Every structure is written in structure tokens, then in C-alpha cells.
Amino acid sequence: MGKARGDEAYFQRSSLFWVTIIILSFGYYTWVIFWPESIPYQSLGPLGPFTQYLLKHHHTLVHAWYWLAWMIHVGESLYAIVLCKSKGITNTWTQLLWFLQTFLFGLASLYYLIAFRPKHQKQT
């Protein structure tokens, strides 16, 4: 969290709020994709019947969107590496942290990297 050893190692954790929302959403979506028969649809309020409807009438689309979401996260992660290099974040471990965090949490992570403004070195 915050800065460590200057711009070359800048890293900021994503907001706990967004991390929680994304984990719960992707967790539920993964459950729907891989184990739909084990979901207690009646206990989920309006989300249960809606999920059943989507699986029954749009099964292929639900699966396609799931894999598309993961592919988008891969793309965002690769972009995070490019951004790290362009913003002077050269520490390999820090770049890996940005890659992993962006892969797991997408724009909730990438936002902090996009917003980061490195200090410019004075030319002498």
C-alpha cells in the first residue's frame, strides 16, 4: 500500500469494498457455471429465479460471458504491465503484484495504476 522505495516500486492495493464485490460476484458466477445443480435457488431471493432463467434460456451466452470476462481480465493484466513500464515502475516484484491484482480485480486495480503520476526526474 502506498509508495515503497520510490516510483520504481509503487503499488496500491485495491479498495476492500470493490475486492469484496468482485470476489463475491465472480465466486457466484463460477458456482453457476461449474456447479449449477448445487445452488439453492429458492434461498437467493430474486437472484435465484433470475439465475435459473438465464441458465435455462441463455446457457451458451452465460458460459461465453464468463470466459469473456476472464479474457478481459487477462488483457487488463497485460496492459497493467505496459503501464508499469511506461510509468517507471521497474521493480519486477511490483510489476508482478500489479499483474496479479489486475488479473483478479480488473479495473478496480487498474484504476490506481492509471491514476498514478510518477515524479519526474530533474535533468542536469
Curated annotation (Swiss-Prot):
The chain crosses the membrane at residues 16-36, 62-82, 96-116. Keywords: Membrane, Transmembrane, Transmembrane helix. This is Transmembrane protein 254. InterPro entries: TMEM254. It is found in: Membrane. It is a multi-pass membrane protein. Its main location: membrane. GO terms for cellular component: membrane. The keyword Transmembrane applies.
